[in-house]
A protein has these predicted regions:
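Conserved N-terminal phosphate-binding loop of PLP-dependent enzymes in the Aspartate aminotransferase
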Residues: 1-169
Length: 169
């Protein structure tokens, strides 16, 4: 279905898909409009591993998996859910935060003068005590299922209680 450029209404002359296309295996794809691709055809050479087929197989596997499981829709849904819950939990615990990012790469910041970095570090430390390695940014993936998100948000709830009490003192 394309990349994020379609979602946000851009029509780029060229798009390059890299490492994620093969889920870490060596493959990339270059697509573009006819004018750009015609020029690129005369100048573009990439042959470092062009006889190696694992990257191609991985790329096809990733594309098929994404199509079959509607990964982009899943990731956006999870990202929106977490963004909304961050805001609800912050309001519940009287914390001032702002939430930013695309639905698939989300983050929050505390809105306390000169304390954001400290509070993010505190958030990370307290989440570790909940057995979750987390900071204020999440790169959503298909692995983020309901049970994982629920556990994460329950831990955020507990951690926000502690941060709220810290700010009050």
């Amino acid at each position: 279905k394309g990349g994020i450029y379609k979602e946000i209404g851009l029509k780029p002359n060229m798009v390059i898909y890299g490492k994620a296309l093969g889920n870490g295996f060596a493959i990339s794809a270059v697509i573009g409009n006819k004018k750009v691709m015609d020029v690129a055809q005369d100048t573009f050479v990439s042959s470092t591993a062009w006889t190696e087929r694992v990257g191609f197989a991985a790329g096809l596997g990733v594309i098929n998996f994404h199509k079959k499981n509607n990964v982009f829709v899943h990731n956006k849904k999870i990202g929106k859910q977490i963004k909304n819950e961050w805001l609800k939990l912050a309001k519940k615990h009287k914390l001032k935060i702002e939430v930013n990012g695309l639905d698939t790469i989300i983050n929050f910041n505390f809105l306390y003068k000169n304390k954001n970095d400290y509070l993010i570090t505190l958030f990370t430390e307290l989440m570790l005590k909940e057995n979750i390695l987390a900071n204020n940014t999440i790169y959503i993936s298909y692995s983020h299922k309901k049970s994982i998100v629920s556990k994460y948000l329950n831990s955020v709830d507990k951690v926000f209680v502690r941060i709220s009490s810290f700010i009050k003192t």
